[in-house]
Amino acid sequence: MATMLTSDEAGKLLDFSQKLDINLLDKIVEVVYTAQGEQLRLAQSILTTLKEHPEAWTRVDSILEYSQNQRTKFYALQILEEVIKTRWKVLPRNQCEGIKKYVVSLIIKTSSDPIVMEQNKVYLNKLNMILVHILKREWPRNWETFISDIVGASKTNESLCMNNMVILKNLSEEVFDFSQGQITQTKAKHLKDTMCSEFSQIFTLCSFVLENSMNAALIHVTLETLLRFLNWIPLGYIFETQQIETLIFKFLSVPMFRNVTLKCLSEIAGLTAANYDENFATLFKDTMVQLEQIVGQNMNMNHVFKHGSDTEQELVLNLAMFLCTFLKEHGKLVEDAKYVDYLNQALMYLVMISEVEDVEVFKICLEYWNSLVEDLYNSEFFHPTLESTKRQQVYPRRRFYAPILSKVRFIMISRMAKPEEVLVVENENGEVVREFMKDTNSINLYKNMRETLVFLTHLDSVDTDRIMTLKLLNQVNGSEFSWKNLNTLCWAIGSISGAFCEEDEKRFLVTVIKDLLGLCEQKKGKDNKAIIASNIMYVVGQYPRFLRAHWKFLKTVVNKLFEFMHETHDGVQDMACDTFIKIAIKCRRYFVTIQPNEACTFIDEILTTMSSIICDLQPQQVHTFYEAVGYMISAQVDQVQQDVLIERYMQLPNQVWDDIISRASKNVDFLKNMTAVKQLGSILKTNVAACKALGHAYVIQLGRIYLDMLNVYKITSENIIQAIEVNGVNVNNQPLIKTMHVVKKETLNLISEWVSRSNDNQLVMDNFIPPLLDAILLDYQRCKVPSAREPKVLSAMAIIVHKLRQHITNEVPKIFDAVFECTLDMINKNFEDFPQHRLSFYELLQAVNAHCFKAFLNIPPAQFKLVFDSVVWAFKHTMRNVADMGLNILFKMLQNLDQHPGAAQSFYQTYFTDILMQIFSVVTDTSHTAGLPNHAIILAYMFSLVENRKITVNLGPIPDNMIFIQEYVASLLKSAFTHLSDNQVKVFVTGLFNLDENVQAFKEHLRDFLIQIREATGEDDSDLYLEEREAALAEEQSNKHQMQRNIPGMLNPHELPEDMQDE
């Protein structure tokens, strides 16, 4: 049984006046790994306190020498690692040298004997990383001979050489792969340049091992190390030496080296250098010759991957990676006649690998197929009207790839991933269910497969048609019928909408829709019908162009959707409503005009039978249905006819509304009836759906219910407040009170939706705003219970200010009187309470700042100070959306002041230095790293104001504002970060002025300064580059979207703007 740990006993460890008790430390470390409860907490607390002690590192050597416990030794290394990462620059030089020599001697001692090295693998890996951390701080300035030292030592002992390879590999990764954000840009560049300039010694060592060593483990680790070097070393070391030949002819055929060698070849294949084209082609040819010996012509890749060993599975993965990387980068080089057989062999391998039932392997292949078909589409631009056979003659590259691409088409259609719109799925138990959680990976895979299949269809639409028609026939005749086969086929059919020319699409879809409708009648059983229904709905929803051109099909499809709205199988009604609204948006005007051979418009039929259509739908589905019908009515251009349609359209909800209002006018307590309140909430949601679709035209319905709705709002508010006064705040959780809150929220939602869509600001201002402000502002202000205040009031006001702009400037003081101080009082105690009020409060502030800035200049100074303080409070939030909003408000405020010079000077005198102090406090706070781009924009603007003498008032006791701000900022930083040298601060402050006209450079300057601060405080810097990652992704997405718009069928029809769709 383990001995108990006492706090007195453990406290001895923290007494640095005594000799360290190694046995006691071992005991405490063991408690951490074996004990529970209070003993565990005590042990963890002691070890953490010891680790954080500034002198703890001085005990590391004793621990490593005398402890017999590997866990204790690892703990000691963590202490050492921490001091290197956080305090290296403040340690005396002799102590740095001592630590360096000590770590090197430990590594040599542990790695010189292969048996000892194997026994201490984890310990040694930690030592290696500690050495790399030292190198990042010492090399090359304080350790010029490091490369020659490590290379020289490697020649003395194979075991030592193995470990030195690991150190070099780790160093390469740290400098070239992970340096961003951990060391300053200048330091990173210096390390990279040094490593490149001294690489010849490392290369000689690697080559010597690979050519001469008989030690398999050493060869393997050398290949792993070389793999890390290949993406940055000077290209001459790869192409002007025997390196590639050694890899291909010496190691690729050896099973234990095969995978790492293929990885090396993939890394080389990913390089680009036009002057080495011949070398690349030779590399490909030689590798393919070797692969034929290894893989053969007819290996069943799927079987190997499914039933083979880990090594064999990895081979399939690495083979895919090599072929895809090479062909994507250099495929055109090997289209030459002398390499064409090798290219065909490579393509056949890729087709076989594409059939492997593993998503990650398939994604690798998909990326290449996508790049190939996109390149063929773009590089040999063609007329879509050209016959397929002629097309093959005109475009030789397409002719060459055609047989392979036919196989790829078949695979894409057979494996098509599930689109986001499909809600009915087969689960892992073989049951047909509604999908509730979106699978992001599946959606992304679908988008990539869809794009690839669209290109494939453009390249040969006849072949796509042939494969799909054959597969559909096999579904209908039952020879291949299964849920999976039908799903993948229909998902593929839906994915190529717009890729056929219109005539081909018509012929193809007539067959598809008829066959699917027939299949729905033919198959029995609810599960079968649910799967077939979901596929019909997905396919028809993807082809609005076809439906617009073929009225009979459009009517048949919509009637089929109405039929599905009565089908109670999970997910079918949802999909029916979702598909209906998509079709309504894209085909809206065809429903409001009389079509050939019809007695009336289809919208008339829908409105006449609406109650029977929606009788089996859930409330949320009814709202979707109403929104869909609203889009149809919005297409009616005759206002008189449109008003008549709206009246009929809203007849059902209005009947219930009128009944409730009538009964409430006789007895106001009726508005406490649960059924009535629930109905009111649902009716208001229906109105919101109608308003979204109708836009400004909804005004006729809004006018009908507006004043009654505001009265209901007031009474409901009174009822909530009374309930809270009698029963306490927890009454908010009772169903009736919750439903009352829904009524208030939906009232505000409805007003916000309509105002944001209205096209007559004066009409809104004159007729709707006065009663609205009287109703909701007074209610918000009077409510003494913060939790009962409706946050939607704030966001509604923000939307109204954003829409009406200068029209509402005169009302801003009234709005602020009602909501500003009472809300600020709710959110200024901490950063967490009332999150929705918090966000909406700043949305309102942002809207007023952007559109009614004069209102800020007209409020008393005391109230403006509250506004300013609330903005500062905003950007101190760790909630990123609130912090960003605060920074945006501040920057816009500074820009607005530029238009009001008199007010600006007074503002600068009062607030300028305060803003600097507050911004620097968040810039240097690690929880605000994501705000760095906005911090840089604001600070650069402020420093440019000072430098360009835009501030004429004195900011401090020194007449020259520039000198004063330099001294102020330097003093601010020096007092906050005492470990910084005067020179570091001086260089930083000088840069703030020198770079204030270049925001990007200014931001990099800030970032380097943050790295210097964190380097000495030991904090993680990896998040400093978050914005770059986000911006790069956003730019990539934008460019891709622009490209997709130019290729027919590439965008989902529902992503196209209206002017490109509803013709």
UniProtKB/Swiss-Prot annotation:
PROSITE patterns: IMPORTIN_B_NT (PS50166). High expression observed in the developing embryonic brain, hind gut and posterior spiracles shortly before dorsal closure; and in the ventral nerve cord, midgut and somatic musculature shortly after dorsal closure. Expression increases when the tissue is well developed. Its main location: nucleus. One of its GO terms (biological process) is nuclear pore complex assembly. It is found in: Nucleus; Nucleus membrane. Gene3D superfamilies: Leucine-rich Repeat Variant (1.25.10.10). The keyword Nucleus applies. InterPro entries: ARM-like (IPR011989), ARM-type_fold (IPR016024), CRM1_repeat (IPR041123), Exp1_repeat_2 (IPR041235), Exportin-1/Importin-b-like (IPR013598), Importin-beta_N (IPR001494), XPO1/5 (IPR045065), XPO1_C_dom (IPR014877). It is a peripheral membrane protein. Keywords: Membrane, mRNA transport, Nucleus, Protein transport, Transport. Disruption phenotype: RNAi-mediated knockdown results in defects in nuclear export resulting in accumulation of RpS2 and pre-40S ribosome in the nucleus. During oogenesis, mislocalizes Nup358-containing granules to nurse cells and abolishes the formation of annulate lamellae. The keyword Signal does not apply. GO terms for molecular function: nuclear export signal receptor activity; small GTPase binding. Residues 1034-1063 are annotated as: Disordered. Transmembrane segments: none annotated. Residues 43-109 form the Importin N-terminal domain. It holds the Pfam family IBN_N. It comes from the Eukaryota. Interacts with Clbn (via its N-terminus). Associates with the nuclear pore complex via interaction with mbo and Nup214. Interacts with target proteins containing NES sequences such as actin and dl. Activity inhibited by leptomycin B, which disrupts interaction with the NES and RanGTP. Belongs to the exportin family. Receptor for the leucine-rich nuclear export signal (NES). Binds cooperatively to the NES on its target protein and to the small GTPase Ran in its active GTP-bound form. Involved in the export of dl, RpS2 and the pre-40S ribosome from the nucleus to the cytoplasm. Plays an important role in nuclear pore assembly by mediating nucleoporin condensation and biogenesis of annulate lamellae. Required for the function or maintenance of certain tissues such as brain and gut. PANTHER family: EXPORTIN 1/5, EXPORTIN-1. This is Exportin-1. It comes from Drosophila melanogaster (Fruit fly).
